[in-house]
Amino acid sequence: MVDVLVLGTGITGRLVVQYLNSHRQKASFTFGLAGRSQSKLSGLISEFSLNNVPVFTVDVTNAAEVESVIQHAQVIINTVGPYWLWGNNVISACVRHGKHYVDLTGEPHWVKDIIATFDYVATQTGSIIVPCCGNISIPADVLVFVANKTLKAFAGSSATIDRSVSAWSLIGLGLSGGTAASMLAGFEEVPRHKLVASSPDFCLSPVQGVPNLRPRLVYTLPFSSPPVRGSCSAMTLNRQVVFRTWGLHELTSQLNARDSETAETSKALTYGPNFKYEEFMVFPSFFQALMHTVLINIGTITLSICSWARKLARRLLPKAGDGPSDEYLEKGAVQITNVTTSTDPQSRPTVIRTTFDGRGEPAYLLSSIMVAESALCIILNGRELPPVAKSGGVLTPMSAFGDVLVERLKACGRIEIRSEILLDADRKNADNTKKTR
């Protein structure tokens, strides 16, 4: 029996194994490898000198094989996508046997399906199922969670959020054959009605919120000087994950309202009934942001309705097994600034600025760290997890791991998270600040 089982031998699986093998707490946990290709498994064993690490050969399309293998671990890190095609057998086995699960999916249609299929059963077996534990969507979820804590520490536990906006800068973003296959599978394999049903902002939330802010051609970060502008984000799942976290916290607070022992703790995690969230990709100029928004929308529509466009994309995008080099992975970065404003109709709102800075290529190197630390939250900090996690279910990174994951990410050596109150919300040049976290 191992604590963590890494499923998959592609570029992300390799990076997760590399990270776990050199982890600062390596002596406190055990891990194993699982994959379909014996030669790739042997290659990883040889590359990282993992002679004492258990290895399992498994085909994720074979439910019986998956069922047998997952019983040898406490937490499964699943790096095998597209998850719409290959993920259900793994989650089904985990839920049935009370095992825990994290992955790196960016497929909202699949997340919506697994919530409907597995959430209730997971609460009965105590299985913690947390999809979306990579650069999609941990930074977005973390930023709002931390901003909410900063707000309540400054303005009191009854303070609520009106609007939260994140401005993303992704430097040196890589692309592998597996990610390309997952993207194209969303257009070719998923029924159209599933894609439509998984597009609303609150489609993953157990609670319906107020209407979110309307999409725009060009976005501007509030209280930024000079103005930080950008285009629509292609990572729509980020908003949906943030709203599921909001909904799970709202629902938990409502259920615990009459319990004096848990009511205050639950309320502290809520963002407020009028919470709205949006994000965008930063561009140097208004024109570049506008053109990116137009091209993203044209490209998405073309890929969704034109088979010739998907065939062309398949020829141009990386093939299975292809991916960025180790040298390339070290050159990337993610820099995100979030501005959150409180709901305060009688006076000036409180404004919080929170930043998330990651050193390394975001989609693979940083994602492998995020998903590995998510798994270790369960193994090494299980008693410290939020009450929602202890009940099991299909959760989000912040509803399942909360402060535990925030602190683990800050300790990994590549990620910095800071949050501060802007003292003068009326001035766009917000240099006068007070640090609170």
Write out the residue ranges for each language-model feature.
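N-terminal Rossmann NAD(P)H-binding glycine-rich loop of SDR-like oxidoreductase domains
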Residues: 3-23
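C-terminal catalytic/substrate-binding lobe primarily of soluble NAD(P)-dependent oxidoreductases
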Residues: 13, 126, 149-437
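Conserved beta-strand positions in the Rossmann-like core of class I SAM-dependent methyltransferases
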Residues: 29-32
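N-terminal Rossmann-fold cofactor-binding loop
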Residues: 34-38, 59-60
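Short, conserved SAM-binding/catalytic segment
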Residues: 44-51
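Conserved Rossmann-fold cofactor-binding substructure of NAD(P)-dependent oxidoreductases
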Residues: 57-73, 79-85
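ADP-ribose/adenylate-binding Rossmann-like module
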Residues: 82, 93-111
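Rossmann-fold NAD(P)-binding glycine/threonine-rich loop
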Residues: 105-127
